[in-house]
Amino acid sequence: MFPARRGLHTTSRACARTRFTKPKPKPAKRENVRLPTQRTHHDNDLKITAPIPPAAANLTCPDDHPLWQFFSEKKFLRTPEELDTLSRPWTIPELRRKSFTDLHSLWYTCLKERNVLARENHLVQFNFEAQTEAYQDISEKIRTTMWRIRHVLSERDWAFKIANEKFAVEKQVFIESFEKDFLEAPANEDEEIFESLQRFQYAIYGISEYIDENKVDRTFVDGLKAVATLKLKKFALRNEDIKNFLEESNNTIVDAGESFLLYTSENTESAIAEACQAVRELRENGSSVSRYDELETVQEYVNKLAEAQMAKVTEAEIQLQEEDAKNNANTL
């Protein structure tokens, strides 16, 4: 009789063999056994070579690596004799004659040089325990130039703010004065007076003659309307049809689409007359731009005009290249 063992009522079920727990039969011995396709480190061809000692010659660094900017002419460390000790900081009067681009470039040149000096000063002070006065003196000169650059930029910023405050009071007077001179100029001075109109629109409304450089905002759209009205008034004194169109518009252009069409037309009497006829057709068709959609619509117009101008420039360059190729072929 077998001795009884205590167990749970699920023990027999858990210990029972199933088709998943039965051991699989041993596979039959194969006659054609293939060799492994990958050679292991136990191969007899293994050769032990001497370790390669770490050295700078074993490392390669591209010449355009950004971290080279922390080194002066790719030198690990300059000696005090190699430093430029005869230079002086830029003076404020000298910096006032520089443009914003020049000041921006000079600022970052000074900043990079100070970073190079700070690294060299740290190496000399903590690694070689030598004197660092030469590095600190040059860094202080550069720092003087940098705070003077900020001083000049601050002067310009305050001058711009004060001029804007004063001009806000006199702006309308200036616009009326320019409009009077613009309309009273004789026809033989059209070229000069329209050049002054370009300077006027850039100074008052920020409208550049290069269409792709403009930022479309409320001031830009208001400037388009003002310039379009000025061009109509200029040629209304010479053309009766343009005069009638201006009277129909109550002596001002208020639609952004109409103003853009008149603004982009040539500064000639015939071109303005054609633009007036095109605007009449737009009005007859009921095509207008809502004031709420002016910015988005004008931005689309500007983008399309810029693309068209770029296509013309590309086509002209291709034609010029073809002509040069023909001339060279004829020469040969």
From Swiss-Prot:
Residues 19-40 are annotated as: Disordered. GO terms for molecular function: structural constituent of ribosome. The keyword Ribonucleoprotein applies. It comes from the Eukaryota. Residues 264-327 form a coiled coil. Its main location: mitochondrion. It is found in: Mitochondrion. GO terms for cellular component: mitochondrial large ribosomal subunit. The keyword Ribonucleoprotein applies. One of its GO terms (biological process) is mitochondrial translation. Keywords: Coiled coil, Mitochondrion, Ribonucleoprotein, Ribosomal protein, Transit peptide. Component of the mitochondrial large ribosomal subunit. Mature mitochondrial ribosomes consist of a small (37S) and a large (54S) subunit. The 37S subunit contains at least 33 different proteins and 1 molecule of RNA (15S). The 54S subunit contains at least 45 different proteins and 1 molecule of RNA (21S). Belongs to the universal ribosomal protein uL29 family. This is Large ribosomal subunit protein uL29m. It comes from Kluyveromyces lactis (strain ATCC 8585 / CBS 2359 / DSM 70799 / NBRC 1267 / NRRL Y-1140 / WM37).
